[in-house]
Amino acid sequence: MRHRHGYRKLGRTSAHRKALLKNLAIALIEYGKIEIGVFKAKELQSYIEKLITAARSGDLNAHRYVFAYLQNKSATKKLITEIAPKYASRNGGYTRIQRTRLRRGDASQMAIIELV
C-alpha cells in the first residue's frame, strides 16, 4: 500500500526520477512555462517551490543549495538573480498548474506548469 507516501515514483528508478526533475526544473526556469503530464507537473511543482524558497535569501548558501540540485550555472544564476527576488514578499505558491488536453498518442492528461 502507498498510504502516506510522500512522492510519486513516476515509473522510474530513483536516479532516473532525480535526473528527470532536475531537467524539468531547468526547462521551467529557462522558459517560464512548459507543457508536461499532470503527475510530472505536480512533482515538479513541489521540487521547484522548495528551490525558489531557498533562493529567496540570495546568499552564498542559497547559491550552493540550488546549484547542488540543478547542477547548471545559468539556471542557478537566473533563479537567484531574476526569479527569486520577484517572490520576496510571497510565501509559497510560486507556480500554477493548468490542465490542458489529452495527449493524442496515449490519451494522457497534459498540463501547463508556469511561474506565477
Curated annotation (Swiss-Prot):
GO molecular function, one term: structural constituent of ribosome
GO biological process: translation
GO CC annotation terms, alphabetical: cytosolic large ribosomal subunit
InterPro entries attached to this UniProt entry: Ribosomal_bL17, Ribosomal_bL17_sf
One Pfam family recorded for the sequence: Ribosomal_L17
Keyword Chaperone appears in the UniProt entry: no
Entry keyword Isomerase: no
Keywords for the protein's UniProt record, in alphabetical order: Ribonucleoprotein, Ribosomal protein
Subunit structure: Part of the 50S ribosomal subunit. Contacts protein L32.
Family statement: Belongs to the bacterial ribosomal protein bL17 family.
Protein name: Large ribosomal subunit protein bL17
Organism, as annotated: Helicobacter hepaticus (strain ATCC 51449 / 3B1)
